[in-house]
């Protein structure tokens, strides 16, 4: 494909955009000042100043990239760690058969850059966690098209952390980076505008998402009973076990990599044989290791359009932006509903209060761990616990030294009424932690 001349725009390229930014309207923000021929500030902002980050270059991400580029945005970064699979081609329209096996971010960026005059999409084939805070500070707005709750929680927490509150308790407006979050599942979808520290954050509504099926860690480690326990053991402990030979770096485990998944399957199968458990299959291993979400091209198009409209409105002030959640259901016709998610008191990310958690004093730490990992408010994945300056249970290198604590009661571990337990988890970014106050029911 030939690259178009990016030195000038084609005549009439932005005629539809100009109809919005060159005249005011009933829904325009009070601060909106229409562009003039002598002072095209909004168009200059779109094309030169407003840098947008797109997270995800899959079904939703392809639509988002196309929409942003055709809306006048020229400085776009896209992050996606995945490679293109042949099953993506029916809906992820920026990819072709020759692209199978290549980076989604790199191919999508190259396609947009070659097709749309003047657009500069910079790809990054990596995890969002691989970028530091300074990288994210450069963007005017972030738009996420992710199918992972964990990743959405992480970027939400990071953007909340980037907000600076001065000594007077006031938020520094320049440190607010809005997050436009889109998600689809089959014929359903949602678009949401999150203003960190101002509106409710993603974590405030975490209990609206069904928690993933989880199992008690002590059961996985000591008394597995079903095939899923063996697969979870391979994920949680097999990858960390230095005595097990692996053809890859455990820190770089990728559930989309066939070689990595084959290793996981064989590891789980050996674990199952040890405990005389039948039923570990490659397909089941895939199902446990990753959640496969059905995708419909038309749903992606609708939600991407809604998300990009919000980005455009926010950057141009041409209309008030969404406050703050829109849901779509196309299962039996076309249905949309908009409402405001309220800030949740005691939110682990944007709240300031301790989270109160009630539990029986005789419960073991293992039971406590199981309760907080299955609680829809938190949906922890691999939590580590500290209280009174000591480690109660830790992941990683300190796992072996703290495992014995799992069978002890909270009182035996000297956790008293109203004591604070600090919980860190991979789902939370950086040094963010949940502070939990313990209340005993008996």
Curated annotation (Swiss-Prot):
Pfam families: E2_bind (PF08825), ThiF (PF00899). PANTHER family: NEDD8-ACTIVATING ENZYME E1 CATALYTIC SUBUNIT (PTHR10953:SF6), UBIQUITIN-ACTIVATING ENZYME E1 (PTHR10953). Signal peptide: none annotated. This is NEDD8-activating enzyme E1 catalytic subunit. Heterodimer of uba3 and nae1. The complex binds nedd8 and ube2m. The gene is uba3. One of its GO terms (cellular component) is cytoplasm. It catalyses: ATP + [NEDD8 protein] + [E1 NEDD8-activating enzyme]-L-cysteine = AMP + diphosphate + [E1 NEDD8-activating enzyme]-S-[NEDD8 protein]-yl-L-cysteine. Pathway: Protein modification; protein neddylation. GO terms for molecular function: ATP binding; NEDD8 activating enzyme activity. Regulatory subunit of the dimeric uba3-nae1 E1 enzyme. E1 activates nedd8 by first adenylating its C-terminal glycine residue with ATP, thereafter linking this residue to the side chain of the catalytic cysteine, yielding a nedd8-uba3 thioester and free AMP. E1 finally transfers nedd8 to the catalytic cysteine of ube2m. It comes from the Eukaryota. Keywords: ATP-binding, Ligase, Nucleotide-binding, Ubl conjugation pathway. Arg-192 acts as a selectivity gate, preventing misactivation of ubiquitin by this nedd8-specific E1 complex. Nae1 and uba3 correspond to the N-terminal and the C-terminal part of yeast uba3. In yeast the two subunits form a single polypeptide chain. The record marks 192 as: Determines specificity for NEDD8. The keyword ATP-binding applies. InterPro entries: E2-binding, ThiF/MoeB/HesA, ThiF_NAD_FAD-bd, Ub_act_enz_dom_a_sf, Uba3_N, Ubiquitin-activating_enz. ATP binds at residues 80-104, 128-151. CDD domains: Uba3_RUB. Belongs to the ubiquitin-activating E1 family. UBA3 subfamily. SUPFAM superfamilies: Activating enzymes of the ubiquitin-like proteins. The active site is at residue 218. Transmembrane segments: none annotated. Its EC number is 6.2.1.64. GO terms for biological process: protein neddylation.
């Amino acid at each position: 494909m030939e690259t178009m001349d990016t030195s000038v725009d084609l005549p009439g390229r932005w005629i539809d955009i100009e109809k919005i930014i060159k005249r005011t309207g009933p829904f325009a923000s009070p601060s909106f000042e229409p562009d003039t021929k002598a002072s095209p500030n909004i168009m200059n902002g779109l094309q030169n100043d407003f840098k947008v980050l797109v997270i995800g270059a899959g079904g939703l991400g392809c639509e988002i990239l196309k929409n942003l580029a055709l809306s006048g945005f020229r400085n776009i970064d896209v992050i996606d760690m995945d490679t293109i699979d042949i099953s993506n081609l029916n809906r992820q329209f920026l990819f072709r058969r020759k692209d199978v096996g290549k980076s989604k971010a790199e191919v999508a960026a190259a396609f947009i850059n070659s097709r749309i005059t003047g657009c500069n999409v910079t790809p990054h084939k990596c995890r969002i966690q691989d970028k530091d805070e300074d990288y994210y500070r450069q963007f005017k707005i972030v738009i996420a098209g992710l199918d992972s709750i964990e990743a959405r929680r992480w970027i939400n927490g990071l953007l909340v952390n980037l907000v600076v509150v001065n000594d007077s308790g006031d938020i520094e407006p320049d440190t607010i980076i809005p997050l436009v979050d889109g998600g689809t599942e089959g014929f359903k979808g949602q678009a949401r505008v999150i203003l960190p520290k101002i509106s409710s954050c993603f974590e405030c509504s975490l209990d609206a998402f069904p928690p993933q099926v989880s199992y008690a860690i002590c059961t996985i480690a000591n008394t597995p009973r079903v095939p899923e326990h063996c697969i979870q053991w391979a994920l949680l402990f097999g990858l960390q076990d230095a005595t097990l030979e692996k053809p890859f770096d455990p820190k770089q485990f990728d559930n989309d990599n066939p070689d990595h998944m084959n290793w996981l399957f064989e590891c789980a199968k050996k674990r199952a044989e040890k405990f005389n458990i039948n039923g570990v299959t490659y397909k089941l291993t895939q199902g446990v290791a990753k959640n496969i979400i059905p995708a419909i091209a038309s749903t992606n198009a609708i939600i991407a359009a809604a998300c990009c409209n919000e980005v455009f409105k926010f950057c141009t002030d041409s209309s008030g932006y969404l406050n703050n959640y829109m849901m779509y259901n196309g299962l039996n016709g076309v249905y949309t509903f908009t409402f405001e998610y309220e800030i949740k008191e005691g939110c682990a990310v944007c709240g300031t209060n301790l989270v109160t958690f009630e539990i029986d004093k005789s419960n073991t730490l293992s039971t406590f761990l199981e309760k907080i990992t299955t609680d829809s408010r938190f949906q922890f994945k691999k939590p580590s616990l500290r209280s009174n300056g000591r480690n109660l249970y830790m992941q990683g290198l300190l796992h072996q030294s703290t495992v014995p604590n799992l069978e002890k009661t909270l009182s035996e571990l000297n956790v008293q009424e109203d004591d604070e337990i600090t919980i860190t988890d991979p789902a939370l970014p950086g040094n963010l932690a949940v502070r939990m106050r313990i209340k005993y029911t008996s």
